Amino acid sequence: NKAAITPDKFQRVIQEMQEADIKFLIQQSNLRNSETGSQEMKDLRAAIKEADSNEKKAINKLEVSGYASPEGGLDLNTKLATDRQKNAQKFLQKQLKKDKVKTDIASEITAEDWAGFQAAMENSNMQDKDLVLRVLGMYSDPEERETQIKNLSSVYKTIAEEILPELRRSRLILTTDLIGKSDDEIKELAKNDPAQLNVEELLYAATLTNDNAEKIAIYQKVASQFGDYRAYNNMGMIYFEQGNIAEARRAYGKALEIAPNNADVNYNAGLAAMADNDLKKAEEYLGKAAGTQGNLSAAMGTFYTMKGDYKAAKSAYGNVATNNAAVQQILNEDYAAARQTLANVKEPNATTAYLTAVVAARTNDRDAVYSNM
């Protein structure tokens, strides 16, 4: 049974979004200086320049969307949303030209912003907002819903004065790629200045080497800097694969002190306990391993085989094709099934060949005995 690694969550490129709204007066699409000169717009402009000039950033997408509030007619709203989008985009293009930023601009319009209306209502302090939304939700026809919104806005001032004006807008959205450290940078820092790396970067550094001693050294740094259970678990996995069961169990024990209910750590601790013939502890750990990335069915099959409960082992293994599953089938004298299992082992090794020879010997297949010895 293979131990389960607890992986890093390192992402070299992380995306962040920044938005700015330009509001319009009712049934108008002309830009106002109070809107184009807002702090929100200034911040967006600065973010675009920064994303364009910083080598650790890149503009992923720049989008301008035009909207109309949902109380007007469809034709009027479509024209308003289109004009608002176009005017906002022209303004943005002029800014980009001044700032010498070259990038494409995506466009979109929403003629009747019903979704925006619902969201604004839900976030409002209006006392009857749930009732209003339930009433409007009864109308699937947009034109009928427009009429009802008009009627309600004449009754509820909050709708007319606070909700609808927020929906008469263009929205400018910048998506920026934040570009992380290169593999070479991470390897260098992991070796000489690990304090400059966050926990995910340092865990990722361990995947950049095939030297187990280097991996363990990195995991020790993760453990000392961050106290992250994954460092101990992954150290334990290396020790387990090296056959150093005592060190593996110690490492898994430390991981369990931090994350006692983690399925992968419990699974690994169970494997190590079985390797130590500590079936009582193995049963305890494997009982908490539901949801592990590891092959829990195979582990339980091995556990029951070690206990001598071959019927339970057969049930646990199911159709798993592993050497241990074949051992259980051989013990049950189900040689045809064992032969099939061994033929389907994904990574056959010397044990696979030996077990195939055992099956051949038990079924008087001399040629197969010799070819697998």
What are these regions, as identified by a protein language model?
Residues 231-232, 265, 296, 352:
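TPR alpha-solenoid repeat register
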Residues 4-6, 24, 29-65, 93, ...:
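Periplasmic peptidoglycan-binding/anchoring modules of Gram-negative envelope and division proteins
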Residues 221-222, 254-255, 286-289, 313-316, ...:
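Canonical positions in the second alpha-helix
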Residues 196, 226-227, 260, 291-294, ...:
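Short coil turns that delineate tetratricopeptide repeat
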Residues 241-242, 275-276, 306, 331-332, ...:
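Register position in tetratricopeptide repeats
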Residues 69-173:
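Periplasmic OmpA-like peptidoglycan-binding domain that tethers envelope proteins to the cell wall
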